[in-house]
């Protein structure tokens, strides 16, 4: 719908505003909320879903971009939804529904959502502001939802929001988007204290949508709705969802939930691969860090897990390493969160599960599994060392592993006693009652107890293995009862001579029919050797053949089944080819969707002049890693702070084998000012001019919506690939992190 009035400034886009000198270079002129999110305009993708909600916009492409953003909202692709809605505002700053879209895209970021919808609220207050009643209903609902001054009770605001959307549906029964968003928020609010009273009722609303548009992306909400209630009800949606919005990775991911719960691991893996590939292709195009993408790390960890369930040992470990090889960022991804956390946990888990003991020992002393500063975070790596040494029969090395863990346990206990003493003395000094003194002591005690218990369990487990190596199976069994082996209790019972227990656990595992190949293979092996006359191991092997079509036959877990397979008369390759289920729709070729693993994208080449008009080319740095710093000229004070910090630490960069090249928005004549700003002589790295900002734009260090450059820091490897980046309203100032992460990534992506 075209806006029915014209204002003198209507044709003025956001990026044409007069600069405000009080705003820092790189910061948005439209408010703090605009400093985050995408700041580069993208094309119409035409792969984000067949959706439509009529809006009022003076821009001829406004409706198309709004529909794209709406489809991205349905796919929880919030980052890209912002890009679509910002594109509208860059051409039509009075499009209230674009602000609605930005607010919706920040459902999980209340502060930014309120800032965006407040902009729409200002427009609504204008007497001559003309939009449809339909749009006004959407906007009023969003404004009221975020108005915590008028209604402080968040639960009431959520209930009012649901009622407002019900009214939109009642007044506009053909509005499929209102119905879809109603179901979406109803499911989301279920997690916020407003339980769904009727899943069937919500599903009936979805069926109304699908009756009009069979391939509406609301299949996404059908999967969420039924995921934990009755997953089989969402099998049709699982088959369709990816094709409804093929450009959105999350829409390929979600069917994996349903197929995993249905134990259809081949189908789950296909979906999760599709999701990973679409994500990787997109992030490489836009120089995005993997963890900027919603649910990216969750998808790829689950993919690694399902690879393991299928017995695809190498694929499982490679995906775990892929997560660890992703670039890290202080705001997104570190050993305690995101890709790094998922990858570390998965790699340690699957090396042990697949019994790759030698590879495990090689990996724990490599950049893949670096030593973490906190002992409690590093415990899983330390434990893996001990488990691997035990399984390799290395008694001396196992003792060393135990001796490497015990001092941490001792320190936790000492610190616990010291904390209790301090807490007691403090409480007594404050003349607290005896009950309060004991409570203070207990609080101090409890903050250490979790870590103490974790370390005690590992020490008990490893000492049990050591006892078994010395023939003391009584102690080994006691340890096993206190601390069951995380991965292979059946094999431990078998090794300790407790065949009855090994047979009992193995048979129970075979009877579960959970289709997890590695666990089943161990159960078959254990039952065969513990109680061969029990035919359950034969049944288990026949099951394994049917759903183990992808297992790595040379992996230790499956290789030891070869004699059993021969005894049963199976061929050397005993796997039976997998047959696709009949409820699947046609699928695209996976390779066409993108690469399976994140691959550093090639850095755009350039050749720019320095202050002496000498051309400096990126190609000159080929063969060695380099850090590119995009800074906004000598007049930018916080840019100068970054340049000074990097110049002061230049020797540390050199020791790490890292060169630095700075690209400035200054013209050649003003480049010298940057040198003059540095009080300690000449800046020890080259500075080149990109006054036209062409290279800034190629590296996406540019706000296309407001036509201004952004701060950017990039790490390139010797092959000229972008390993890491930070593009922001502010320069990246954590120099220690930059050096450490650059070293790590360069070592992993040579």
Where are the regions that the model predicts?
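N-proximal helix/coil linker or "cap" segments that precede and/or mark the start of modular domains
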Residues: 549-605, 619-622
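Residue at a conserved register position within TPR or TPR-like alpha-solenoid repeats
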Residues: 72, 106, 144, 186, ...
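Thiol-/selenol-based redox modules, centered on thioredoxin-like
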Residues: 709-750
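Short active-site neighborhood of thiol/selenol oxidoreductases, capturing the structured segment around
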Residues: 618-646
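Structural microenvironment flanking redox-active thiols in thiol-disulfide oxidoreductases
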Residues: 640-681, 693-698
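N-terminal alpha-helical interaction modules that lie
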Residues: 18-219, 231, 243-245, 263-274, ...
């Amino acid at each position: 719908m075209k806006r029915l009035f014209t204002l003198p400034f209507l044709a003025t886009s956001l990026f044409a505003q007069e600069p405000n000198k009080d705003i820092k270079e790189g910061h948005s002129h439209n408010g703090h909320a605009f400093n985050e999110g995408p700041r580069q305009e993208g094309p119409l993708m035409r792969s984000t879903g067949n959706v439509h909600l009529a809006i009022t916009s003076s821009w001829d492409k406004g409706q198309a971009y709004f529909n794209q953003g709406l489809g991205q909202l349905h796919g929880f692709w919030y980052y890209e939804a912002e890009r679509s809605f910002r594109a509208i505002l860059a051409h039509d700053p009075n499009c209230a529904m674009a602000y609605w879209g930005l607010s919706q895209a920040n459902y999980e970021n209340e502060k930014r959502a309120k800032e965006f919808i407040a902009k729409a609220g200002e427009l609504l207050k204008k007497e001559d502001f003309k939009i449809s009643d339909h749009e006004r209903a959407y906007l009023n609902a969003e404004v009221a939802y975020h108005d915590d001054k008028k209604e402080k009770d968040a639960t009431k605001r959520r209930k009012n929001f649901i009622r407002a959307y019900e009214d939109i549906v009642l007044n506009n029964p053909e509005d499929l988007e209102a119905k879809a968003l109603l179901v979406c928020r109803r499911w989301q609010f279920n997690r916020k204290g407003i339980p769904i009273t009727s899943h069937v009722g919500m599903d009936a609303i979805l069926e109304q949508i699908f009756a009009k548009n069979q391939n509406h992306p609301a299949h996404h909400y059908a999967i969420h709705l039924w995921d934990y209630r009755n997953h089989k009800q969402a099998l049709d949606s699982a088959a369709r969802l990816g094709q409804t919005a093929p450009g959105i990775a999350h829409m390929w991911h979600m069917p994996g939930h349903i197929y995993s719960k249905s134990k259809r691991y081949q189908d789950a893996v296909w979906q999760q691969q599709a999701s990973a590939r679409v994500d990787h292709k997109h992030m490489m195009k836009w120089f995005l860090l993997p963890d900027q993408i919603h649910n990216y790390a969750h998808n790829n960890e689950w993919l690694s897990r399902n690879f393991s369930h299928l017995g695809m040992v190498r694929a499982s470990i490679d995906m775990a390493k892929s997560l660890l090889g992703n670039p890290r960022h202080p705001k997104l991804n570190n050993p305690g969160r995101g890709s790094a956390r998922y990858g570390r946990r998965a790699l340690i888990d699957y090396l042990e599960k697949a019994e790759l003991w030698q590879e495990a020992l090689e990996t724990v002393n490599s950049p893949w599994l670096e030593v973490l500063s906190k002992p409690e975070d590093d415990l899983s790596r330390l434990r893996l060392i001990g488990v691997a040494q035990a399984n390799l029969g290395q008694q001396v090395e196992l003792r060393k592993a135990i001796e490497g863990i015990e001092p941490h346990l001792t320190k936790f206990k000492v610190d616990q006693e010291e904390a209790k003493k301090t807490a007691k003395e403090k409480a007594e000094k404050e003349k607290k009652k005896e009950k309060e003194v004991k409570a203070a002591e207990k609080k101090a005690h409890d903050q250490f107890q979790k870590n103490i218990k974790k370390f005690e369990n590992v020490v008990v487990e490893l000492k049990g293995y050591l006892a078994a190596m010395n023939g003391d199976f009584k102690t080994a069994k006691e340890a096993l009862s206190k601390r069951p082996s995380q991965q292979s209790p059946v094999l431990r019972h078998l090794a300790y001579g407790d065949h009855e227990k090994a047979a009992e656990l193995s048979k129970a595992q075979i009877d579960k029919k959970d289709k997890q190949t590695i666990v089943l293979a161990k159960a078959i092996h254990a039952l065969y050797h513990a109680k061969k006359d029990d035919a359950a191991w034969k049944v288990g092997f026949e099951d394994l053949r049917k759903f183990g079509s992808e297992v790595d036959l040379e992996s230790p877990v499956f290789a030891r089944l070869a004699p059993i397979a021969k005894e049963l008369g199976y061929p050397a390759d005993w796997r039976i080819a997998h047959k696709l289920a009949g409820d699947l729709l046609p699928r695209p070729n996976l390779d066409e969707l993108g690469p399976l693993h994140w691959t550093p994208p090639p850095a755009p080449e350039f050749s720019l002049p320095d202050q002496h008009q000498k051309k400096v080319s990126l190609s000159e740095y080929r063969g060695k890693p380099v850090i590119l710093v995009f800074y906004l000229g000598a007049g930018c004070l916080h840019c100068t702070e970054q340049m000074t910090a990097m110049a002061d630490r230049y020797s540390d960069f050199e020791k790490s084998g890292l060169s630095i090249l700075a690209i400035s928005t200054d013209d050649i004549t003003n480049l010298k000012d940057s040198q003059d700003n540095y009080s300690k002589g000449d800046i020890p790295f080259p500075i080149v001019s990109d006054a036209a900002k062409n290279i800034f734009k190629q590296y996406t260090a540019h706000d296309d919506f407001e036509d201004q450059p952004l701060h950017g820091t990039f790490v390139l490897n010797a092959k000229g690939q972008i390993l890491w980046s930070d593009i922001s309203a502010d320069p990246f100032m954590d120099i220690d992190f930059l050096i450490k992460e650059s070293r790590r990534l360069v070592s992993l992506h040579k």
